[in-house]
Amino acid sequence: MSVKQLADDIASLSNDLVGDAEKQGSGNQAAGRRARVASGKIAKLCKEFRKASLAA
């Protein structure tokens, strides 16, 4: 996966995370779970991004 694609995926998941975190603040527990899942995916993508950026 290219650095550009990884950056786009991270940005998209970050937007989802922010939206779900706001919903969780309003008491939506399902949104809290989605936010936690998104944060895990972001962490994995950040590791891949770091490797890809060093290889580029």
Where are these regions (language model features)?
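N-terminal intrinsically disordered, cationic/polar leader segments
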Residues: M1-G19, G25-S26, S39-L45, R50-A56
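Short, charged, amphipathic alpha-helical segments
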Residues: G32-V37
